[in-house]
Each structure stands twice: as structure tokens, then as C-alpha cells.
Amino acid sequence: MKSLEPILDVFQPGLKRGAARLPFAPHKRYFYVEHPTEGWRVYLRACTFLHEAGQPFQASRFLVVKKFGANASQKTWEPPKGQMEAKDTSPKKSVLKLLHENVQREVEEESKVQSFQNLRHTGMVFQGREPDYPENHFFQYHIFQAYVTPEEIENALLEFEWLNEHPKAFARLRKDKREKDDLSWFSPRSTRLMGRWSPSIVAMYIHKYE
């Protein structure tokens, strides 16, 4: 469920850092920050809205990716997003820097877009709680924005086309790189949003900028 709590400040100094295995993916360790006295814990996630460089800005025109093997006409699309894992963190880097690096990795893995411009944190945060979270545990999606050239979009589409034509090669990719199998511009009718959180995140983003 979406949290009714105030948005917690994960950038404040003095927070503890750690990682935990969660029931839905016990083989991974997910990064969190925790307040040393108040006791709240936040698992960090990011969602990135990729717009076309050189075109007039339209909040509702952004790239989405499709869940691997799923029916494109169903609720199987979302902007590139993901959770920060322990392996992607460093105690010497700020939380904001770690989020930026996580976005760069997730965007490349999910959308095959390898180069984008003007990546920035929008200041928007979607905070919630998973049903199996202990009391005072939360997640936050930090909302990023970036711009992609038409050439880079075409390269990503060609890579997806090649991978879908060569399923054995696709299957050999690391699991994180084969979670999605198509790329498109968002359309409420033809690229319907998947999952519990993506529809709310997209609605929040469009509402802010339109």
C-alpha cells in the first residue's frame, strides 16, 4: 500500500546503511538506509522517465519497456525502474550519487538505452510499504528524468529486435538484462502499465509536469 506517512529524508547525514534479503527475491540483498534513533528503514528504488532529446517537452511522451515474454496488449509495460542492491553501493559515495549510478545501470539493462543526457533527480519521491514489510519499514521510488537522442532510441530498438530474433542469445544474457524484451513510447491504450506501483508513479509524474 502507499504510505500515508510523511516522505522520509533519506539524504540526511547520520543514517545507517545496510542490506537485507527480502522474501520475493531471497537470492539478492537490497540496500536500505535506517534512522539510528527513530528506527525507520527505507529501501531505495528509482524510476526514470526518458524523453526524446531535441523535441518539445511532453510529460506523457516517455519510453516504456515490456515485461519479458508477456502479451504486449496486456498490462505489461512500465518506465525503466529498479531496486538498489547491496552490490551496487559504496560507503564512500552519497546516497544521491548511488541513486544516479543505479539509474544508469537499470536504464541500460531494461531499455538497452546506453547513452542519455541531462539525467536529474526531479525531487519527486513515491513512498510506500509492501504488504509483508515490518512496521516502520518503507520503500521509496526516486523519480529521475533524462533525454535520449533518436539515434540512441533506434539503436535500442534494433538491439531488442536482434535479441528477439535470436532467443538463444537472449537466454544467455544475465537475468537482469533479460527482464524486458521491447521498447515503446507510452500510450494509455497500447502500452498499459503493469504492477502495483507504476500506474501511480506515472500519474504523479504527468500531473506534476502537465
Descriptions of predicted regions:
Residues 2-56, 70:
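Acidic, metal-coordinating catalytic segment for phosphate/diphosphate chemistry
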Residues 57-113:
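Conserved Nudix-box catalytic region and its N-terminal flanking loop in Nudix hydrolases
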Residues 30-39, 130-133, 168-173:
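Short, P/G- and charge-enriched loop/turn segments at secondary-structure junctions
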Residues 47, 61, 182:
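Conserved beta-strand and immediately adjacent loop positions that scaffold enzyme active sites
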Residues 114-125:
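A short coil-to-beta-strand element that immediately follows conserved catalytic motifs
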Residues 50-52, 66, 147-150:
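Residue-level signal for short segments within beta-strands and strand-turn junctions
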Residues 43-47, 138-143:
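Short hydrophobic/aromatic beta-strand or adjacent loop that forms the aromatic wall/cage
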Residues 72-76, 80-82, 137, 143-145, ...:
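Nudix hydrolase/Nudix homology domain
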